[in-house]
Amino acid sequence: MKRLHTLLAALAVTAAANAQIGAPYIHDPSTLAECDGKYYTFGTGGGGLISDDGWSWHSGADRPGGGAAPDVLKIGDRYLCIYGATGGGLGGGHAGRILTMWNKTLDPKSPDFKWSEAVEVCASDGMEDQDAIDPGLLLDPTTGRLWVSYGTYFGTIRLIELDPKTGFRKKGNKEKDIAIDCEASDLMYRDGWYYLLGTHGTCCDGVNSTYNIVVGRSRSVEGPYLDNVGRDMYHGGGKMVIAAEDRACGAGHFGRYIIDEGVEVMSFHWEADFELSGRSVLAVRPIVWKNGWPIAGDNFKGGNFWIESERRGYALELTVDFVRMQQERQGWFNRNQMEQPVKPIANQTLAEVIDTWPKGDIPARISDYMNRPHQRWTITPVNEAGGYLSNPYFKITIQGTDRALAATGNKEVTTVAAYTGADEQLWRIEQLTDGTYRIMPKAIPGMEGVNKEYCLYSAGDSTPTLAKYDFNTDNCKWNFKKR
């Protein structure tokens, strides 16, 4: 019975793959924020979620004021929170107020935790075609100016400017309409382009919500924001970023979080996760940039693969002798073979070669992919080992065996005869912004704490090692080819 319960629990975690684990229940999540090693997000109604590792989430974040759809941004050594007090039909109409407040920390247990008095920065009267709700923040990295986009389907998406030192409305600033037919907007900047993200479709209808996230871009923060075919978002344009998936629907309230150069994630909610009673949950997915446009990447889920280096296209493998497969010699000159019926040749099996392998640790290397047992890897999530933003850690073993890839104390990679669950045998796998992946050991023997610097690295065409991550070299990048 105990084994059955364990199996069912594992299946439940696997089935809820669209959501983070723990209690990730939230609606209208703010952009993720990091404070003293923990991650925070705030939602409609006050409060929010906290995570120690970015994978398992629980309630406990504290935000006064109630209201809806907050956003949060670290500016200097303080955190600015912005939220809608009413509007969006919450009070029976569309008269709304957007307010800002500051805190030195997001940790409600800290002695420094205290929100400043909330200050109104804009409002809607319920009569005009505008709704002061759903604010999103952007601190322009090129100018230092602080912008807010806000609004709903009730009217336009508007842009205003705040003073980044006070969080107050910039004196003399006049609002500008920049989009329609969306809500829960957000702004981001990349490579000379400003991007306006908007949530399109129907909200708050559970498994029937059609929410999806669209985007346009502009060379100016004030627009116009055009999509991939030139449609202005002020006239209903928008390129799809993420929509419903097989077991979840209602993607809304985009937020961008940069982990490292070339490592970005988007936070949002699913209006309904079908595996979690159709509840609204936090989701975190990689951002992949394709031809200058953001799209939702895929959280790695494990399976059977060969692991290919981006540097050369060679495969990661065990350093063992190559065992030849038996086949009658071919050629135009072998008339006897040419007259035989055609039949398939079976792949080489593990049983045919495993006894030729050493019994202890076997170093890893990189070589031509030949679909041989020493090149076939099984990658399995280890949910009980914790995780990082978007995923749990994984173990990487030779398919059909317990032989596991591991980091060594001298920053090399080897395989140990049997997986033990040690931190150096756990791997962080993240999709990069170009669609490739980085692979990082959770820990390196002899180094303190969780490893956040060193990744699997092609030191040469045939030599894997561990080296500091650098997005600007293909030596750090890998691809997983499904078997």
Predicted regions located by residue number:
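Sec-dependent signal peptide recognition
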Residues: 2-9
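Hydrophobic h-region of N-terminal signal peptides that target proteins for export
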Residues: 9-18
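Signature of short aromatic-glycine-proline-rich micro-motifs recurring in repeat-based ectodomains
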Residues: 244-258
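Short, surface-exposed coil-to-beta transition loops
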Residues: 250-252, 280-281, 450-453
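Lectin-like carbohydrate-binding module/patch detector with strong preference for beta-trefoil
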Residues: 302-483
